[in-house]
Protein backbone atom coordinates (compact mmCIF):
# COMPACT_ATOMS: atom_id res chain seq x y z
CA UNK A 1 0.00 0.00 0.00
CA UNK A 2 1.15 3.52 -0.83
CA UNK A 3 -0.89 6.17 0.95
CA UNK A 4 -2.09 9.51 -0.36
CA UNK A 5 -0.87 12.29 1.95
CA UNK A 6 -1.92 15.41 0.07
CA UNK A 7 -4.32 16.50 -2.67
CA UNK A 8 -4.22 20.00 -4.10
CA UNK A 9 -6.50 21.55 -6.72
CA UNK A 10 -5.70 24.78 -8.54
CA UNK A 11 -7.33 26.96 -11.17
CA UNK A 12 -5.40 27.04 -14.47
CA UNK A 13 -6.35 28.05 -18.03
CA UNK A 14 -7.41 25.84 -20.91
CA UNK A 15 -6.79 26.34 -24.63
CA UNK A 16 -9.68 28.81 -24.93
CA UNK A 17 -8.43 30.97 -22.07
CA UNK A 18 -11.13 29.67 -19.73
CA UNK A 19 -10.38 28.36 -16.24
CA UNK A 20 -10.15 24.65 -15.58
CA UNK A 21 -9.08 22.42 -12.70
CA UNK A 22 -5.61 20.96 -12.25
CA UNK A 23 -4.94 18.51 -9.42
CA UNK A 24 -1.79 17.22 -7.72
CA UNK A 25 -1.98 13.98 -5.74
CA UNK A 26 1.02 13.52 -3.43
CA UNK A 27 2.05 10.13 -2.02
CA UNK A 28 3.89 9.29 1.19
CA UNK A 29 6.96 8.41 -0.91
CA UNK A 30 7.07 11.94 -2.35
CA UNK A 31 5.72 10.92 -5.76
CA UNK A 32 3.33 13.44 -7.35
CA UNK A 33 0.68 12.75 -9.98
CA UNK A 34 -0.75 15.73 -11.85
CA UNK A 35 -3.76 15.98 -14.15
CA UNK A 36 -5.64 18.83 -15.84
CA UNK A 37 -9.32 18.56 -16.75
CA UNK A 38 -10.65 19.37 -20.26
CA UNK A 39 -13.90 21.17 -21.10
CA UNK A 40 -16.34 20.93 -24.00
CA UNK A 41 -18.13 23.57 -26.12
CA UNK A 42 -20.89 21.37 -27.54
CA UNK A 43 -21.94 19.43 -24.47
CA UNK A 44 -24.59 16.74 -24.08
CA UNK A 45 -27.42 17.30 -21.61
CA UNK A 46 -26.69 13.92 -20.03
CA UNK A 47 -23.04 14.71 -19.22
CA UNK A 48 -21.68 14.84 -15.69
CA UNK A 49 -21.81 18.37 -14.29
CA UNK A 50 -18.85 20.69 -14.67
CA UNK A 51 -18.94 22.98 -11.62
CA UNK A 52 -18.43 26.68 -12.42
CA UNK A 53 -18.49 29.55 -9.95
CA UNK A 54 -21.05 31.76 -11.70
CA UNK A 55 -19.36 34.94 -10.43
CA UNK A 56 -19.58 37.35 -13.38
CA UNK A 57 -16.83 39.49 -11.85
CA UNK A 58 -14.30 36.65 -12.31
CA UNK A 59 -13.62 35.01 -15.67
CA UNK A 60 -17.11 35.98 -16.86
CA UNK A 61 -18.62 33.52 -14.40
CA UNK A 62 -16.52 30.58 -15.59
CA UNK A 63 -14.16 30.35 -12.62
CA UNK A 64 -13.62 26.96 -10.99
CA UNK A 65 -12.70 27.97 -7.45
CA UNK A 66 -15.69 26.04 -6.07
CA UNK A 67 -14.43 22.87 -7.75
CA UNK A 68 -10.93 23.51 -6.39
CA UNK A 69 -12.45 23.99 -2.93
CA UNK A 70 -14.10 20.57 -3.32
CA UNK A 71 -10.70 19.06 -4.08
CA UNK A 72 -8.86 20.82 -1.27
CA UNK A 73 -11.62 20.25 1.29
CA UNK A 74 -14.05 17.34 1.23
CA UNK A 75 -12.21 15.17 -1.29
CA UNK A 76 -8.86 15.58 0.46
CA UNK A 77 -10.46 14.73 3.80
CA UNK A 78 -12.09 11.60 2.35
CA UNK A 79 -9.09 10.23 0.43
CA UNK A 80 -6.18 11.18 2.67
CA UNK A 81 -4.45 8.01 3.87
CA UNK A 82 -6.11 5.77 1.26
CA UNK A 83 -4.14 3.43 -1.02
CA UNK A 84 -3.48 5.20 -4.32
CA UNK A 85 -3.49 1.88 -6.19
CA UNK A 86 -7.13 1.14 -5.36
CA UNK A 87 -8.54 3.23 -8.21
CA UNK A 88 -12.04 1.76 -8.04
CA UNK A 89 -12.37 2.45 -4.32
CA UNK A 90 -10.98 5.99 -4.69
CA UNK A 91 -13.49 6.76 -7.45
CA UNK A 92 -16.40 5.13 -5.60
CA UNK A 93 -15.55 7.10 -2.46
CA UNK A 94 -15.75 10.37 -4.41
CA UNK A 95 -18.98 9.36 -6.17
CA UNK A 96 -20.60 8.45 -2.85
CA UNK A 97 -19.29 11.62 -1.22
CA UNK A 98 -20.82 13.74 -3.99
CA UNK A 99 -24.16 11.95 -3.65
CA UNK A 100 -25.74 13.17 -6.90
CA UNK A 101 -26.43 11.34 -10.16
CA UNK A 102 -24.35 13.77 -12.24
CA UNK A 103 -21.59 14.75 -9.78
CA UNK A 104 -23.03 18.26 -9.53
CA UNK A 105 -22.37 18.88 -5.82
CA UNK A 106 -18.59 18.52 -5.81
CA UNK A 107 -18.24 18.92 -9.58
CA UNK A 108 -17.22 16.32 -12.13
CA UNK A 109 -14.24 18.53 -12.96
CA UNK A 110 -13.06 18.24 -9.33
CA UNK A 111 -13.64 14.48 -9.12
CA UNK A 112 -12.04 13.74 -12.50
CA UNK A 113 -8.94 15.79 -11.72
CA UNK A 114 -8.35 13.74 -8.58
CA UNK A 115 -9.19 10.44 -10.31
CA UNK A 116 -6.67 10.97 -13.12
CA UNK A 117 -3.98 12.48 -10.90
CA UNK A 118 -4.24 9.48 -8.56
CA UNK A 119 -3.78 7.07 -11.48
CA UNK A 120 -0.74 9.00 -12.68
CA UNK A 121 0.75 9.01 -9.18
CA UNK A 122 0.16 5.26 -8.88
CA UNK A 123 1.80 4.64 -12.26
CA UNK A 124 4.80 6.73 -11.28
CA UNK A 125 5.08 4.91 -7.95
CA UNK A 126 4.96 1.58 -9.78
CA UNK A 127 7.69 2.65 -12.19
CA UNK A 128 5.39 2.12 -15.16
CA UNK A 129 4.19 4.43 -17.94
CA UNK A 130 0.51 5.30 -17.52
CA UNK A 131 -0.65 3.24 -20.52
CA UNK A 132 1.02 0.13 -19.11
CA UNK A 133 -0.17 0.73 -15.53
CA UNK A 134 -3.80 1.16 -16.61
CA UNK A 135 -3.88 -1.29 -19.51
CA UNK A 136 -1.60 -4.08 -18.34
CA UNK A 137 0.75 -6.25 -20.37
CA UNK A 138 -1.44 -6.38 -23.49
CA UNK A 139 -1.75 -2.60 -24.00
CA UNK A 140 0.03 -2.32 -27.33
CA UNK A 141 -2.39 -1.01 -29.98
CA UNK A 142 -1.61 2.47 -31.31
CA UNK A 143 -4.79 4.24 -32.42
CA UNK A 144 -5.73 5.57 -35.83
CA UNK A 145 -5.98 9.35 -35.42
CA UNK A 146 -9.17 11.14 -36.43
CA UNK A 147 -7.64 14.47 -37.44
CA UNK A 148 -10.04 17.39 -37.47
CA UNK A 149 -8.77 19.58 -40.31
CA UNK A 150 -11.90 21.63 -41.12
CA UNK A 151 -13.98 23.03 -38.25
CA UNK A 152 -17.59 24.19 -38.35
CA UNK A 153 -20.56 24.31 -36.01
CA UNK A 154 -19.89 25.34 -32.41
CA UNK A 155 -16.12 25.12 -32.97
CA UNK A 156 -15.85 27.91 -35.54
CA UNK A 157 -17.35 31.21 -36.68
CA UNK A 158 -18.41 30.12 -40.15
CA UNK A 159 -21.62 28.91 -41.85
CA UNK A 160 -20.70 25.20 -41.96
CA UNK A 161 -23.31 23.24 -39.98
CA UNK A 162 -21.30 20.04 -39.49
CA UNK A 163 -18.85 20.52 -36.65
CA UNK A 164 -15.84 18.47 -37.73
CA UNK A 165 -14.41 17.12 -40.97
CA UNK A 166 -11.66 14.61 -40.22
CA UNK A 167 -9.08 12.50 -42.01
CA UNK A 168 -8.08 9.01 -40.86
CA UNK A 169 -4.75 7.68 -42.22
CA UNK A 170 -5.74 4.00 -42.13
CA UNK A 171 -3.15 3.08 -44.76
CA UNK A 172 -0.17 4.09 -42.62
CA UNK A 173 2.16 1.39 -41.31
CA UNK A 174 2.57 3.01 -37.89
CA UNK A 175 1.04 5.72 -35.73
CA UNK A 176 4.02 8.01 -36.27
CA UNK A 177 3.63 7.60 -40.04
CA UNK A 178 -0.10 8.34 -39.72
CA UNK A 179 0.74 11.56 -37.89
CA UNK A 180 3.20 12.51 -40.65
CA UNK A 181 0.58 11.82 -43.33
CA UNK A 182 -1.95 13.92 -41.46
CA UNK A 183 0.49 16.81 -41.10
CA UNK A 184 1.26 16.73 -44.82
CA UNK A 185 -2.44 16.82 -45.73
CA UNK A 186 -2.99 19.63 -43.21
CA UNK A 187 -0.34 21.78 -44.90
CA UNK A 188 -1.64 20.88 -48.36
CA UNK A 189 -5.13 21.94 -47.27
CA UNK A 190 -3.81 25.26 -45.98
CA UNK A 191 -2.29 26.05 -49.38
CA UNK A 192 -5.36 24.79 -51.26
CA UNK A 193 -7.68 27.00 -49.21
CA UNK A 194 -5.37 30.00 -49.51
CA UNK A 195 -5.04 29.59 -53.28
CA UNK A 196 -8.86 29.56 -53.51
CA UNK A 197 -9.07 32.85 -51.60
CA UNK A 198 -10.26 31.44 -48.28
CA UNK A 199 -8.92 32.40 -44.87
CA UNK A 200 -6.78 29.90 -43.02
CA UNK A 201 -7.68 30.87 -39.46
CA UNK A 202 -8.02 27.87 -37.16
CA UNK A 203 -10.87 26.90 -34.84
CA UNK A 204 -10.85 25.62 -31.26
CA UNK A 205 -9.40 22.25 -32.23
CA UNK A 206 -6.76 23.52 -34.64
CA UNK A 207 -8.57 22.84 -37.90
CA UNK A 208 -9.20 25.48 -40.51
CA UNK A 209 -12.46 27.44 -40.35
CA UNK A 210 -13.02 28.72 -43.90
CA UNK A 211 -16.20 30.47 -44.95
CA UNK A 212 -17.63 27.53 -46.92
CA UNK A 213 -21.30 27.16 -47.71
CA UNK A 214 -21.77 23.39 -47.51
CA UNK A 215 -20.43 20.08 -46.27
CA UNK A 216 -19.75 19.04 -49.85
CA UNK A 217 -17.47 22.04 -50.39
CA UNK A 218 -15.49 21.15 -47.27
CA UNK A 219 -15.18 17.52 -48.34
CA UNK A 220 -14.08 18.50 -51.86
CA UNK A 221 -11.28 20.66 -50.48
CA UNK A 222 -10.13 17.80 -48.26
CA UNK A 223 -10.20 15.27 -51.12
CA UNK A 224 -8.10 17.58 -53.28
CA UNK A 225 -5.63 18.16 -50.44
CA UNK A 226 -5.17 14.43 -49.81
CA UNK A 227 -4.27 13.98 -53.48
CA UNK A 228 -2.00 17.05 -53.47
CA UNK A 229 -0.12 15.53 -50.53
CA UNK A 230 0.47 12.41 -52.62
CA UNK A 231 -2.08 10.05 -51.06
CA UNK A 232 -5.14 8.20 -52.32
CA UNK A 233 -8.50 9.07 -50.73
CA UNK A 234 -10.38 5.89 -49.90
CA UNK A 235 -7.19 3.86 -49.71
CA UNK A 236 -4.45 5.63 -47.76
CA UNK A 237 -6.75 8.07 -46.02
CA UNK A 238 -10.45 7.82 -45.17
CA UNK A 239 -12.84 10.55 -44.01
CA UNK A 240 -14.92 10.99 -40.86
CA UNK A 241 -17.56 13.48 -39.71
CA UNK A 242 -18.71 14.80 -36.37
CA UNK A 243 -22.11 16.27 -37.15
CA UNK A 244 -22.90 17.37 -33.55
CA UNK A 245 -26.51 17.34 -34.70
CA UNK A 246 -27.94 18.11 -31.26
CA UNK A 247 -26.68 21.64 -31.94
CA UNK A 248 -29.02 22.11 -34.93
CA UNK A 249 -31.99 19.98 -33.80
CA UNK A 250 -34.92 22.38 -33.37
CA UNK A 251 -38.48 21.33 -32.53
CA UNK A 252 -38.15 17.90 -34.10
CA UNK A 253 -36.36 19.10 -37.24
CA UNK A 254 -32.71 19.33 -38.24
CA UNK A 255 -32.19 22.95 -39.26
CA UNK A 256 -28.93 23.43 -41.18
CA UNK A 257 -28.93 27.22 -41.23
CA UNK A 258 -25.64 27.56 -43.11
CA UNK A 259 -26.76 25.28 -45.93
CA UNK A 260 -30.28 26.75 -45.72
CA UNK A 261 -31.85 23.29 -45.49
CA UNK A 262 -34.23 21.65 -43.03
CA UNK A 263 -34.59 17.88 -42.72
CA UNK A 264 -36.84 15.47 -40.90
CA UNK A 265 -35.25 12.26 -39.64
CA UNK A 266 -35.63 10.34 -42.90
CA UNK A 267 -34.35 13.29 -44.91
CA UNK A 268 -31.28 13.64 -42.72
CA UNK A 269 -30.45 9.95 -43.07
CA UNK A 270 -30.75 10.27 -46.87
CA UNK A 271 -28.40 13.27 -46.74
CA UNK A 272 -25.80 11.22 -44.86
CA UNK A 273 -26.28 8.25 -47.18
CA UNK A 274 -25.62 10.50 -50.17
CA UNK A 275 -22.40 11.80 -48.58
CA UNK A 276 -21.26 8.25 -47.79
CA UNK A 277 -21.96 7.25 -51.39
CA UNK A 278 -19.98 10.18 -52.78
CA UNK A 279 -16.97 10.30 -50.44
CA UNK A 280 -14.85 7.69 -48.57
CA UNK A 281 -16.54 8.38 -45.23
CA UNK A 282 -16.14 5.53 -42.73
CA UNK A 283 -17.31 7.21 -39.52
CA UNK A 284 -20.16 9.55 -38.57
CA UNK A 285 -20.39 10.89 -35.02
CA UNK A 286 -23.61 12.23 -33.50
CA UNK A 287 -25.50 11.88 -36.75
CA UNK A 288 -28.74 12.38 -34.82
CA UNK A 289 -29.57 14.41 -31.71
CA UNK A 290 -28.91 12.95 -28.27
CA UNK A 291 -32.56 12.17 -27.46
CA UNK A 292 -33.79 11.49 -31.00
CA UNK A 293 -33.82 7.73 -30.53
CA UNK A 294 -36.11 7.21 -33.53
CA UNK A 295 -33.63 9.06 -35.72
CA UNK A 296 -30.76 6.98 -34.34
CA UNK A 297 -32.67 3.79 -35.12
CA UNK A 298 -33.29 4.91 -38.71
CA UNK A 299 -29.65 5.93 -39.13
CA UNK A 300 -28.31 2.67 -37.70
CA UNK A 301 -30.62 0.59 -39.89
CA UNK A 302 -29.58 2.53 -43.00
CA UNK A 303 -25.83 2.87 -42.53
CA UNK A 304 -24.76 0.80 -39.53
CA UNK A 305 -23.53 -2.15 -41.59
CA UNK A 306 -20.95 -0.11 -43.51
CA UNK A 307 -20.18 3.01 -41.47
CA UNK A 308 -19.02 3.48 -37.89
CA UNK A 309 -21.82 5.41 -36.14
CA UNK A 310 -20.37 7.03 -33.04
CA UNK A 311 -22.49 8.07 -30.08
CA UNK A 312 -21.06 11.07 -28.24
CA UNK A 313 -23.96 13.13 -26.87
CA UNK A 314 -26.04 9.95 -27.17
CA UNK A 315 -23.92 7.96 -24.70
CA UNK A 316 -21.82 10.63 -22.88
CA UNK A 317 -19.31 7.92 -21.84
CA UNK A 318 -21.95 6.69 -19.39
CA UNK A 319 -22.25 2.90 -18.94
CA UNK A 320 -25.99 3.22 -18.20
CA UNK A 321 -26.65 5.26 -21.37
CA UNK A 322 -24.48 2.88 -23.40
CA UNK A 323 -26.32 -0.16 -22.06
CA UNK A 324 -29.61 1.44 -23.16
CA UNK A 325 -28.19 2.04 -26.64
CA UNK A 326 -26.86 -1.50 -26.96
CA UNK A 327 -30.23 -2.93 -25.93
CA UNK A 328 -32.04 -0.78 -28.51
CA UNK A 329 -29.46 -1.33 -31.26
CA UNK A 330 -28.53 2.35 -31.55
CA UNK A 331 -25.19 3.31 -33.17
CA UNK A 332 -22.25 0.90 -33.15
CA UNK A 333 -19.51 2.91 -31.45
CA UNK A 334 -18.96 5.09 -28.39
CA UNK A 335 -16.94 8.28 -28.12
CA UNK A 336 -14.97 8.24 -24.87
CA UNK A 337 -14.48 11.55 -23.07
CA UNK A 338 -13.25 11.20 -19.52
CA UNK A 339 -14.91 14.42 -18.35
CA UNK A 340 -18.35 13.34 -19.56
CA UNK A 341 -18.56 10.71 -16.83
CA UNK A 342 -16.02 12.10 -14.36
CA UNK A 343 -13.88 9.17 -13.16
CA UNK A 344 -11.28 6.90 -14.71
CA UNK A 345 -12.91 3.69 -13.48
CA UNK A 346 -16.29 4.56 -15.01
CA UNK A 347 -14.54 5.47 -18.27
CA UNK A 348 -12.82 2.08 -18.39
CA UNK A 349 -16.13 0.38 -17.59
CA UNK A 350 -17.78 2.09 -20.57
CA UNK A 351 -14.99 1.03 -22.96
CA UNK A 352 -15.13 -2.55 -21.68
CA UNK A 353 -18.91 -2.67 -22.07
CA UNK A 354 -18.65 -1.35 -25.63
CA UNK A 355 -16.05 -3.91 -26.65
CA UNK A 356 -18.02 -6.80 -25.15
CA UNK A 357 -21.09 -5.72 -27.15
CA UNK A 358 -19.13 -5.52 -30.40
CA UNK A 359 -19.11 -1.71 -30.41
CA UNK A 360 -15.95 0.19 -31.21
CA UNK A 361 -14.59 2.93 -28.94
CA UNK A 362 -12.91 6.22 -29.84
CA UNK A 363 -10.83 8.00 -27.19
CA UNK A 364 -11.44 11.75 -27.41
CA UNK A 365 -10.28 15.18 -26.33
CA UNK A 366 -12.57 18.17 -25.76
CA UNK A 367 -12.54 21.50 -27.58
CA UNK A 368 -11.18 23.14 -24.42
CA UNK A 369 -7.90 21.31 -23.75
CA UNK A 370 -4.58 21.73 -21.94
CA UNK A 371 -1.07 20.37 -22.38
CA UNK A 372 -2.16 17.26 -20.43
CA UNK A 373 -1.70 14.20 -22.67
CA UNK A 374 -3.44 11.56 -20.51
CA UNK A 375 -5.89 10.53 -23.25
CA UNK A 376 -3.02 9.37 -25.47
CA UNK A 377 -2.03 6.87 -22.78
CA UNK A 378 -5.66 5.85 -22.23
CA UNK A 379 -6.15 5.20 -25.96
CA UNK A 380 -3.29 2.70 -25.84
CA UNK A 381 -4.26 1.34 -22.41
CA UNK A 382 -7.74 0.41 -23.65
CA UNK A 383 -6.59 -0.86 -27.08
CA UNK A 384 -9.51 1.11 -28.50
CA UNK A 385 -7.75 1.61 -31.84
CA UNK A 386 -8.94 5.17 -32.52
CA UNK A 387 -8.24 8.59 -31.04
CA UNK A 388 -9.80 11.95 -31.73
CA UNK A 389 -7.53 14.75 -30.59
CA UNK A 390 -7.82 17.59 -33.04
CA UNK A 391 -5.80 18.95 -35.90
CA UNK A 392 -2.10 19.24 -36.64
CA UNK A 393 -1.75 22.66 -35.04
CA UNK A 394 -2.06 24.17 -31.54
CA UNK A 395 0.22 22.73 -28.88
CA UNK A 396 -2.77 21.54 -26.80
CA UNK A 397 -3.58 19.11 -29.65
CA UNK A 398 0.00 18.30 -30.68
CA UNK A 399 0.82 17.28 -27.08
CA UNK A 400 -1.32 14.16 -27.53
CA UNK A 401 0.19 13.23 -30.90
CA UNK A 402 3.70 13.67 -29.50
CA UNK A 403 2.85 11.39 -26.59
CA UNK A 404 1.60 8.71 -29.01
CA UNK A 405 4.92 8.93 -30.87
CA UNK A 406 6.77 8.42 -27.58
CA UNK A 407 4.58 5.47 -26.58
CA UNK A 408 5.08 3.80 -29.95
CA UNK A 409 8.84 4.21 -29.52
CA UNK A 410 8.67 2.74 -26.00
CA UNK A 411 6.71 -0.28 -27.22
CA UNK A 412 9.19 -0.95 -30.00
CA UNK A 413 8.51 -4.18 -31.87
CA UNK A 414 5.47 -4.88 -29.65
CA UNK A 415 3.64 -1.82 -31.03
CA UNK A 416 0.75 -2.53 -33.39
CA UNK A 417 -0.95 0.22 -35.41
CA UNK A 418 -4.71 -0.35 -35.69
CA UNK A 419 -4.81 0.86 -39.32
CA UNK A 420 -7.46 -0.73 -41.52
CA UNK A 421 -8.59 -3.14 -38.79
CA UNK A 422 -10.93 -0.42 -37.49
CA UNK A 423 -12.93 -0.29 -40.73
CA UNK A 424 -16.33 -1.97 -40.95
CA UNK A 425 -16.39 -4.71 -43.57
From Swiss-Prot:
Keyword Coiled coil in annotation: no
Ligand binding ((2R)-2-phosphoglycerate): 163, 337, 366-367, 388
Residues engaged in binding Mg(2+): 242, 285, 312
Pathway participation: Carbohydrate degradation; glycolysis; pyruvate from D-glyceraldehyde 3-phosphate: step 4/5
Cofactor(s) the protein requires to work: Mg(2+)
Gene3D superfamilies reported in the protein's UniProt record: Enolase-like C-terminal domain, Enolase-like, N-terminal domain
CDD domains: enolase
InterPro entries: Enolase, Enolase-like_C_sf, Enolase-like_N, Enolase_C, Enolase_CS, Enolase_N
EC annotation from Swiss-Prot or TrEMBL: 4.2.1.11
Main location: cytoplasm
GO biological process, one term: glycolytic process
Function: Catalyzes the reversible conversion of 2-phosphoglycerate (2-PG) into phosphoenolpyruvate (PEP). It is essential for the degradation of carbohydrates via glycolysis.
Protein name per Swiss-Prot or TrEMBL: Enolase
Organism encoding this protein: Paramagnetospirillum magneticum (strain ATCC 700264 / AMB-1)
